[in-house]
């Protein structure tokens, strides 16, 4: 439906648009501010803007249409194409954003409700338990005994298995002092696992004449299997460091070679005797000051060492580390003072 709307100014006009030639969609009103000028002019979300102040908006870019609307004088004249309001029973094909939003919210609500009902049906105890009268439903208890444990749901699938024997189809609940199990066949009575009695044991279940229930002996294979499963799940875990230490100690007790241990776990007694009794390296002795050289040593000849500070000329005290030394008798001199003590250069011997 084509119509013309005059919005009284000045700007801002109180509505937002979307679309344009760059979006490949027509320019359309997406939001109208409450108690705004566009609301007073009956501008609605979903209206397609055909012309702005008489100028066609079909080829306008989005920014161009925004600029023309903002800079428009008062009144702002918009030629619109408004779709007819859909009836309550038919909303397909309608382009109104309000109707589309309502329809989307309704679909989301329906989807959420269906999922919540599905979760509740899976999580409710009634959905997991067999219906009354079904061949897998346990018989009702008229008066439960005091101290008996409720039937565990973790073994209901075992109780409902048709391929297992009647004595093996049970659900077990392990409360100390009273252990209870239920047969999964219709018409059978409950199976009670009782502690061992001093009397003779029997491998077959006996019938209790008073309560009409079956008494299962602890020597049965089903009871042993359930006990092994419980013990296997409750087995303590051992750390890898403790396991390595235990293996090393067992190897030493057997007289074998101990296994490799990390440095933080290795005992001091496992070190080799040669390493434990090794003496520290021998320190060189300075031939000038006759003290031990702890750090850096200057090697003059085989077996003759000096401190870097003692490696000096015997005449002027100049350090000979970067210059070399000259022997004159049994003393070290620099080149200058060594030449003064020898007239002939052939008598000099230089050693760097």
Curated annotation (Swiss-Prot):
Polar residues: compositionally biased ranges: 81-95
Q: Per the record, where are the segments of Low complexity compositional bias?
A: 117-135, 258-275
Q: Where is the PDZ domain?
A: 1-84
Is the keyword Cytoplasm assigned to this protein? yes
The modified positions for Phosphothreonine read: 126
Chain positions found as Phosphoserine: 124, 127, 129, 134, 137, 143, 161, 197, 203, 213, 266
Pfam families associated with the record: DUF4749, LIM, PDZ
Q: What GO annotations for molecular function exist for this entry?
A: actin binding; metal ion binding; muscle alpha-actinin binding
Where the protein is mainly located, per its record? cytoplasm
From the Swiss-Prot or TrEMBL record, give the protein name.
PDZ and LIM domain protein 2
Species whose genome carries this gene: Macaca fascicularis
């Amino acid at each position: 439906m084509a119509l013309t709307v005059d919005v009284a100014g000045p700007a801002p006009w109180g509505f937002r648009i979307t679309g344009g030639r760059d979006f490949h969609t027509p320019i359309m009103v997406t939001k109208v501010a409450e108690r705004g000028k566009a609301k007073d002019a009956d501008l609605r979300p979903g209206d397609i803007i055909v012309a702005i102040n008489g100028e066609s908006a079909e080829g306008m870019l989005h920014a161009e249409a925004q600029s023309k609307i903002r800079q428009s004088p008062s009144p702002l004249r918009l030629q619109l194409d408004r779709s007819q309001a859909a009836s309550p029973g038919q909303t397909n094909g309608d382009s109104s954003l309000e109707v589309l939003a309502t329809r989307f919210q309704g679909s989301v609500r329906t989807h959420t409700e269906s999922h919540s009902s599905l979760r509740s049906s899976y999580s409710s105890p009634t959905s997991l338990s067999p219906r009354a009268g079904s061949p897998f439903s346990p018989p009702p208890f008229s008066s439960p005994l005091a101290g008996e444990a409720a039937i565990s749901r973790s073994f209901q699938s075992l109780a409902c298995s048709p391929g297992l024997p009647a004595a093996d189809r049970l659900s077990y609940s392990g409360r100390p002092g009273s252990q209870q199990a239920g047969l999964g066949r219709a018409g059978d009575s409950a199976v009670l696992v009782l502690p061992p009695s001093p009397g003779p044991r029997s491998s077959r279940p006996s019938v209790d004449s008073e309560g009409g229930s079956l008494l299962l002996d602890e020597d049965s294979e089903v009871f042993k299997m359930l006990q092994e499963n419980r013990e296997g799940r409750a087995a303590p875990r051992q750390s890898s460091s403790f396991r390595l230490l235990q293996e090393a100690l067992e190897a030493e007790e057997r007289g074998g070679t101990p296994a490799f241990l990390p440095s933080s776990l290795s005992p001091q007694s496992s070190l080799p005797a040669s390493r434990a009794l090794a003496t520290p390296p021998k320190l060189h002795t300075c031939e000038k000051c006759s003290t031990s050289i702890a750090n850096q040593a200057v090697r003059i000849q085989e077996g003759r060492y000096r401190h870097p500070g003692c490696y000096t000329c015997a005449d002027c005290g100049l350090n000979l580390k970067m210059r070399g030394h000259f022997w004159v008798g049994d003393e070290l001199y620099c080149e200058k003072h060594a030449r003064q003590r020898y007239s002939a250069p052939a008598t000099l011997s230089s050693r760097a």
